[in-house]
Amino acid sequence: MSAPENERRGSARLKVRVPVEIYTEGSAAPLRGATSDLSLSGCYIESIFPFPVGTPLELKLQLEGTLLVVATVVTSDPQVGNGIHFTRMLPEDIEELRTFLENAEKTQ
């Protein structure tokens, strides 16, 4: 990853697949997907039907527990997926994600 991307993102992303449930405003049921990379500040979710940039989302990331994340779509790649920026997480969820990422980095 180049330095400008790291600076723009704020934290390095790891190639890791994590199941995710995606909720949009007014949705009765979640969409299900998986991350292709993940960091403390965001992720990339693969999807053939990506959301438009600016779409607010609520995510449930399935790590050892379930993390609840409020997020916003920052990139939209047709037939590929979305870049997601995390905008709000509970402190304990941040710590669980940090621990998960540290352990994942050791195995890569």
List each model region and its residues:
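N-terminal helix initiation/capping motif
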Residues: M1-L40, R98-Q108
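Short, surface-exposed secondary-structure edge patches
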Residues: S11, E46-P50
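Short conserved beta-strand and strand-loop elements enriched in small hydrophobics
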Residues: V18-T24, G54-L67
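A residue-level detector for short acidic-glycine micro-motifs
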Residues: I22-T24, D37, V73-D77, R88
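Short strand-connecting beta-turns/loops that link adjacent beta-strands
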Residues: S27, P50, E64, P78-Q79
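Short beta-strand-centered aromatic/proline hotspots
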Residues: G33, V69-V74
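Short, solvent-exposed secondary-structure boundary/capping segments
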Residues: Y44-S47, Q79-R88
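Extended Gly/Ser/Thr-rich low-complexity repeat segments
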Residues: P56-Q62, E95-E105
